[in-house]
Regions:
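Interfacial transmembrane-helix termini
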Residues: 1-13, 22-32, 48-64, 82, ...
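Alpha-helical transmembrane segments of multi-pass inner-membrane proteins
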Residues: 31-67, 85-155, 328-329
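Hydrophobic transmembrane alpha-helices and their immediate junctions
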Residues: 42, 153-154, 286-332, 373
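Juxtamembrane membrane-water interface segments that cap and precede transmembrane helices
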Residues: 68-85, 268-282
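Hydrophobic, aromatic-rich transmembrane alpha-helices
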Residues: 95-110, 146, 290-313, 363
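Transmembrane alpha-helices of multi-pass inner-membrane enzymes
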Residues: 145-146, 324-383
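A membrane-periplasm/extracellular boundary helix in multi-pass inner-membrane enzymes
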Residues: 152-223, 241-245
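Long extracytoplasmic/lumenal interhelical loops at the membrane interface
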Residues: 223-287
């Protein structure tokens, strides 16, 4: 799946962008994020708009100069967006990250008139997530909606007791996660009707009355896939047998092209898997226990800083800064079911991609803000 040289280059790139948020002051971070959101938002707005249009028209195109497939992809009877010839989980996470950036920019923007295009872009990214048909990212997005609701409740409502805050968190999770997840089904049904109207107008003028719209509904059995984690359970279960069969992986890991040779012998599936579908297990397989401990320590520190920033009452931290914890939480959750960070997750055209770089850019910003108001975490202070 990856090349060893890509892993090394990726870590240097990620370390560089992580340091960006740590070396800048608060004002510089804000300006940096404004330009970052603008660049990412414009690129993926154009990409998403083009992909949605060609999808609704049931067509596809090849983009120069490489002739990259762009538009409609129909595996397993699912019509989903194909953006730059990537799979649906990669494309949908792109749009998820840009959606989170629009949420941040909405609260960071002081000019109300500029919030209108931000909202339009955010709605398009939300729609694109639904049309990519990645249930992992749909669940992540639904959880992010609940996190945003919790932030808004803590900001505009007064809760003096801990049990009240816990109750708000539970209510937001219980109501908004299933409702947000269901909203993607409603969007798919709506877009199916829009597709039928568009196609009938385009082809009706040519005298072809037999055409119909694209069926964008998801017919997969959600309960069955949840019960077996879409076959991920077998992959996770192969971890310990793999280490017993090839114990040297515990200390030195394995070469990238040999990563799944042993695990696949314990998996019953028609197609061999190419990765562990969990970034922590993937890191362990690639680097062994030493690399795993380093990554686990970084993730633990990051999560603690995220929680601190999310719940802080420090007046120097506004709602916009707190929303930056949402995409980090979403990408970490996504990484429990896919590979996205620390693993050179880009395709053969590049050693990494926007998902991994964005994670470390945002992580650096969050660590910087948290360090400004609390240089040392309480549990890490020296006695």
């Amino acid at each position: 799946m990856v090349r060893e040289s890509d892993l090394v280059l990726t870590m240097f790139l990620c370390a560089a962008v992580l340091a960006t948020g740590l070396v800048l002051d608060a004002g510089q971070r804000r300006r940096f994020m404004n330009w970052f959101c603008l660049a990412v938002g414009l690129f993926y707005f154009c990409s998403g708009l083009l992909a949605i249009v060609v999808n609704l028209l049931d067509i596809y195109i090849y983009l120069p100069p490489e002739g990259v497939l762009f538009g409609l992809e129909v595996p397993e009877s699912l019509h989903y967006l194909n953006v730059f010839n990537t799979n649906r989980t990669i494309s949908s996470l792109w749009f998820y990250i840009t959606l989170c950036m629009m949420v941040y920019q909405f609260f960071a923007c002081k000019r109300r008139a500029l919030r209108i295009p931000i909202v339009i872009a955010g709605l398009l990214f939300y729609l694109a997530i639904g049309m990519c048909f990645s249930r992992t990212v749909k669940i992540v997005t639904a959880g992010s909606v609940a996190m945003l609701a919790v932030l808004l409740a803590f900001r505009y409502l007064s809760f003096k007791r801990l049990w009240q805050k816990c109750l708000v968190v539970l209510i937001c999770a219980a109501l908004l996660i299933p409702l947000s997840f269901k909203s993607f089904d409603w969007l798919s049904s709506l877009m199916s009707q829009v597709s039928e109207v568009l196609i009938s107008q385009v082809y009706g003028e040519q005298g072809d009355e037999s055409v119909s719209g694209v069926d964008l509904t998801d017919s997969r059995d959600l309960k069955e896939d949840i019960s077996n984690l879409s076959e991920r359970g077998q992959i996770y279960a192969s971890f310990i047998p793999t280490l017993k069969t090839d114990p040297k992986r515990i200390l030195i890991g394995s070469f990238a092209d040999k990563l799944m040779t042993v695990p696949n012998t314990f998996i019953v599936f028609p197609i061999p898997f190419t990765h562990m579908h969990n970034f922590l297990l993937e890191v362990f397989m690639l680097t062994g226990l030493p690399g795993f401990l380093l990554v686990a320590a970084f993730c633990l520190l990051l999560v603690l800083r995220m929680l601190h920033l999310f719940f802080t009452k420090d007046p120097r931290i506004g709602l916009a800064e707190k929303t930056l914890t949402i995409p980090l939480a979403g990408i970490l959750l996504y990484g429990m079911f896919e590979v996205v960070i620390f693993t050179a997750c880009g395709d053969r055209r590049a050693p990494t991609d926007m998902r991994e770089l964005s994670f470390f850019i945002i992580a650096g910003i969050v660590l910087g803000y948290s360090h400004d108001i609390l240089p040392k975490l309480p549990g890490l202070k020296r006695k």
